[in-house]
């Protein structure tokens, strides 16, 4: 059986793609006060605006109301995935080739569970990182979580320098 997050993902992802957004993450939390948290990113690389979040929120709210997945009252929060966004899907690694990433693993790989380096390749369910000391090959299924890292290079691009 699918989790509520998976069910929500299945019913909203296509609509968000049609609107020009990537669904990065769905979180359902709370016991007494339920919250559906949605993280989005732009498919064309543009910054996410408050207006974008508002439009996505309206669309998702309408879909969730029709599908009636959540029995009780809930709050819906839509926000940008941010500069140090999570990399959840394998495809994300190809999109961010050359970017610095911090990867936490489910189990030891070469005696470590935490790696930071540039994404140099992503293919056949494997991620290739160029770390300070070496190149590392990581099986995607071994990744617990991963985030982009804000580097000076990225910061300068954001400032337009």
Curated annotation (Swiss-Prot):
GO cellular component, one term: cytosol
Primary location: cytoplasm
Disulfide bonds listed in the record: none
Pfam families xrefs: DUF150_C, RimP_N
Keywords: Cytoplasm, Ribosome biogenesis
Its job: Required for maturation of 30S ribosomal subunits.
Superkingdom of the organism of origin: Bacteria
Location of this chain's protein in the cell: Cytoplasm
One GO term of the biological process aspect: translation
Designated name of the protein: Ribosome maturation factor RimP
Database matches in HAMAP family: RimP
Annotated family: Belongs to the RimP family.
């Amino acid at each position: 059986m699918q989790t509520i997050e998976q069910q929500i993902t299945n019913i909203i992802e296509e609509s968000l793609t049609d609107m020009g957004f990537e669904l990065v993450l769905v979180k359902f939390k709370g016991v007494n006060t339920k919250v559906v948290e949605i993280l989005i990113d732009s498919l064309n690389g543009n910054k996410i605006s408050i207006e974008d979040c508002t439009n996505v929120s309206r669309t998702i709210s309408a879909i969730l109301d029709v599908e009636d997945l959540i029995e009780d009252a809930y709050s819906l929060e839509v926000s940008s995935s941010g500069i140090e966004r999570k990399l959840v899907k394998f495809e994300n690694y190809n999109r961010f080739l050359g970017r610095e990433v911090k990867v936490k693993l489910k189990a030891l790989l070469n005696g470590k569970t935490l790696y930071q380096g540039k994404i140099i390749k992503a293919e056949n369910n494997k991620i290739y990182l160029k770390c300070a000391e070496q190149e590392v090959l990581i099986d995607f299924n071994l990744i617990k979580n991963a985030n982009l890292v804000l580097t000076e290079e990225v910061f300068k691009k954001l400032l337009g320098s």
